[in-house]
């Protein structure tokens, strides 16, 4: 099963300070490009949205510069960019903090409002995925995510709701443990959802393990986890395996504060 859980992942081009405009009159010198690792859904979405790929032998090839410094999760990306005034990288809008600054895209600031009205056009999906077999406990947690309770948390964390008319969550009688694995971009909002859910339904525990989108999708397909987290669209070969996707969010491009 595939579902969009949030709204749109805005590509926030980041440097170092709060979300807003990057003043390009800044320090002189070469720009240090900070990228994510292979397998990252954020990286996959970024190169697609910004056209940083070429087609070779019928396959799309990631053309990220070989000079880029590679980070393996969202927190490391933010810390790396914050510590280098000549750097530029990318994270989800909901992951931005006051150590970095989001670059305007075509004059539009990276805000949830601008994403919702399509002024800020750099967007990608946040999905949760499952295999063919889903436990009652996992289904109940997904019901919570897609309820008005879950959607309100998603909005509070800076993402866009998928369903403005979602109904209030009603706990079922399921018991057990739910393991969620995957994208470090989806991880923070998933942890908030899990925390709130476990206060509402004390019969179920939720464990969130952060890695990358590809690992999350494969783990859900292979039954290693109940729910996979992905910060990109699913590939044809993934959907053919029966993986289903739940959300939508935004991507931001951060740089350093001056």
Question: Where do the PLM segments sit?
Answer:
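Sec-dependent N-terminal signal peptides of Gram-positive bacterial secreted proteins and lipoproteins
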Residues: 4-24
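Exported/periplasmic ABC-transporter solute-binding proteins
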Residues: 4, 24-251, 257
């Amino acid at each position: 099963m595939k579902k969009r859980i949030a709204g749109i992942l805005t590509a926030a081009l980041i440097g170092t300070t709060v979300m807003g405009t990057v003043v390009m009159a800044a320090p002189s010198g070469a720009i240090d490009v900070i990228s994510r690792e292979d397998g990252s859904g954020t990286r996959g979405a970024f190169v697609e949205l910004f056209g940083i790929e070429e087609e070779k032998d019928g396959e799309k090839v990631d053309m990220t510069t070989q000079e880029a410094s590679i980070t393996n999760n969202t927190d490391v990306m933010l810390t790396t960019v914050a510590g280098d005034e000549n750097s530029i990288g990318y994270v989800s809008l909901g992951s931005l903090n006051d150590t970095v600054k989001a670059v305007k895209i075509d004059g539009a600031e990276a805000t949830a409002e601008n994403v919702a009205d399509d002024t800020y056009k750099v967007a990608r999906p946040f999905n949760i995925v499952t295999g063919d077999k889903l436990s009652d406990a996992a289904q109940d947690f997904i019901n919570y995510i897609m309820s008005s309770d879950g959607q309100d948390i998603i909005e509070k964390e800076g993402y866009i709701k998928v369903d403005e008319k979602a109904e209030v969550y009603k706990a079922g009688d399921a018991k057990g443990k739910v393991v969620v694995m995957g994208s470090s971009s989806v991880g923070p909002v998933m942890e908030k959802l899990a925390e709130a859910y476990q206060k509402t339904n004390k019969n179920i525990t939720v464990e969130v393990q952060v890695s990358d989108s590809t690992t999350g999708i494969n783990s859900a397909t292979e039954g290693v986890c109940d729910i996979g987290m992905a910060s990109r669209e699913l590939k044809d070969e993934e959907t053919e395996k029966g993986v289903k996707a739940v959300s939508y969010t935004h991507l931001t491009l951060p740089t350093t504060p001056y």
